[in-house]
């Protein structure tokens, strides 16, 4: 009896699974979107179980080689399309309606809520408009002072290793420096991560990012309903660390809101006005200050609204900057002629004193360093994947993408395609000075900060932060090619499982 019942349930499940998928399967076949062999119910889940951050880049490169520029995977009931075809990039990224992140990222909502990264529709539009003043050039000028000061702290920390013989993994140093910058520019508080890496907020954030990164690569941990069952200890640790972060941020918000209310009460309050020449002036406006003064539909943002945006800013800014700077310094250490050109430009623009402060204007004059950063982000893009959710059938040329599908745009593989970049595996900053090369490259073949309506709102901030830190390090140290080479690893960002290793040798001061 029970055996027959079990067989009946199994048959019904298989029929249900097949009927649920059949329309999309037929559509994929007509559009010649192929992929690995699937089995009922779990789809490609067994292949996904063997996927690790360390083998992700190689595995998906193999899939592209086998199935062409676009292929599909089924993970349990979720359909995923992966593509490096620019016609998909254009249709998806230019759309004003396809703004929802791929379902792959929905587990981040417990951490980031409805912040700019995950929100859509009117909420996303309103929030983005509210955040715009934080990236006004006047605010950025004040932020550069914070970037410069914290890069100086990192340079001091590196002195203990600057003997020309010791191999240093720069990733951990850059990560703490980037966190100091993002927290101070976001909230106006100094967590002093570089001097106090065990500060509760710092430890909690690093733990949350680590766990969430592991979840992205783990089928058993990715789904919210399965996570507490598959890894209960990790689940409880994540909840505890998120609470530590939120309690800290909430406390800062309450304190800053109280200061704002007192200013309104005693008549010293000065409202934020876009276009005001003094925006970000003496008060040195932070992201938090701007959010506290903002309104949506004539209503102030709640503490939860503000915390979500602060958390997104810190989460996105810390990791992406760390990836970009670490890979740039590693590449510079392996290319002495490039390093020499950078140093000559730094002395020419910033002067011979390695401790001289930088300004936004001076950083913008570093054109060769711009090319080095661009080339780094081409070969080692901090964000190698862009995901969107397709709710309804979408026609792209002759191809139909069925609704209820997540599409993952894979710029990492575009950047290494000789169709768009000659000698794609060669680190060659000069390619960005060649007008012929840049003019012949399709616009969407290089999108380190994404493109379209949902591009990165903080890209100017990120470029300044990278230039401030790289310029400070190169003015103080010659970078040497010590340690293991890179081994690409993907979580939320691109990193290296072998570290970003260099040697350091103090520079002789130029007189």
From Swiss-Prot:
A single BP term in Gene Ontology: mating
Compartments it resides in: Endoplasmic reticulum membrane; Microsome membrane
Topology in membrane: Peripheral membrane protein
Cofactor: heme
GO molecular function term, any single one: heme binding
Entry keyword Nucleotidyltransferase: no
UniProt record similarity statement: Belongs to the cytochrome P450 family.
Function noted in UniProt: May be involved in the metabolism of insect hormones and in the breakdown of synthetic insecticides.
PANTHER family in the record: CYTOCHROME P450 4AE1-RELATED, CYTOCHROME P450 FAMILY 4
Protein name, as recorded: Probable cytochrome P450 4d21
Native source organism of the sequence: Drosophila melanogaster (Fruit fly)
Higher taxonomy: Eukaryota, Metazoa, Ecdysozoa, Arthropoda, Hexapoda
């Amino acid at each position: 009896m029970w055996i027959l019942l079990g067989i009946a349930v199994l048959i019904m499940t298989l029929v249900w699974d097949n009927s649920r998928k059949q329309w999309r399967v037929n559509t994929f076949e007509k559009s010649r979107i192929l992929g690995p062999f699937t089995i009922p119910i779990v789809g490609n889940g067994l292949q996904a179980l063997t996927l690790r951050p360390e083998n992700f880049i190689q595995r998906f490169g193999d899939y592209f080689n086998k199935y062409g520029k676009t292929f599909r995977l089924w993970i349990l009931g979720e359909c995923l399309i992966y593509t490096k075809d620019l016609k998909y990039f254009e249709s998806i990224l230019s759309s004003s309606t396809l703004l929802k992140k791929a379902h792959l990222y929905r587990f981040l909502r417990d951490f980031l809520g409805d912040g700019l990264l995950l929100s859509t529709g009117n909420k996303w539009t309103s929030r983005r408009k509210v955040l715009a003043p934080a990236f006004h050039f006047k605010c950025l000028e004040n932020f550069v002072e914070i970037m410069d000061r914290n890069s100086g702290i990192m340079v001091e920390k590196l002195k203990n290793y600057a003997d020309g013989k010791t191999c240093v993994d720069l990733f951990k140093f850059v990560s703490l420096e980037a966190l100091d910058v993002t927290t101070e520019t976001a909230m106006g508080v100094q967590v002093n991560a570089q001097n106090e890496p065990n500060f509760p907020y710092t430890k909690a954030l690093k733990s949350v990012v680590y766990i969430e990164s592991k979840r992205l690569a783990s089928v058993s941990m990715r789904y919210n309903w399965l996570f507490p069952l598959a890894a209960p200890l990790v689940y409880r640790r994540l909840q505890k660390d998120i609470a530590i972060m939120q309690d800290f941020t909430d406390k800062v918000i309450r304190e800053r809101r109280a200061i704002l209310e007192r200013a309104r009460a005693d008549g010293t309050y000065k409202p934020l006005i876009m276009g005001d020449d003094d925006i970000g002036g003496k008060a040195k406006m932070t992201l938090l200050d701007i959010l506290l003064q903002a309104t949506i539909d004539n209503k102030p943002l709640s503490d939860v609204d503000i915390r979500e945006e602060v958390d997104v800013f810190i989460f996105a800014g810390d990791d992406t900057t760390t990836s970009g700077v670490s890979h740039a310094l590693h590449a510079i250490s392996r290319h002495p002629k490039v390093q020499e050109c950078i140093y000559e430009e730094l002395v020419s623009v910033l002067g011979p004193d390695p401790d001289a402060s930088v300004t936004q204007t001076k950083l913008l004059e570093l054109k060769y360093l711009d090319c080095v950063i661009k080339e780094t982000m081409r070969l080692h893009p901090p964000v190698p994947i862009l995901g969107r959710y397709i709710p309804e059938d979408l026609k792209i040329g002759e191809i139909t993408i069925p609704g209820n599908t997540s599409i993952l745009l894979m710029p990492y593989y575009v950047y290494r395609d000789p169709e768009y970049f000659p000698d794609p595996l060669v680190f060659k900053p000069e390619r960005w000075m060649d007008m012929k090369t840049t003019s012949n490259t399709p616009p969407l073949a290089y999108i380190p900060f994404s493109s379209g309506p949902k591009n990165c709102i903080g890209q100017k901030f990120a470029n300044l932060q990278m230039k401030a830190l790289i310029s400070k390090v190169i003015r103080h140290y010659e970078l040497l090619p010590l340690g293991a080479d890179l081994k690409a690893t993907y979580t939320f960002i691109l990193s290296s499982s072998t570290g970003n290793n260099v040697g350091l040798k103090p520079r002789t001061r130029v007189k």
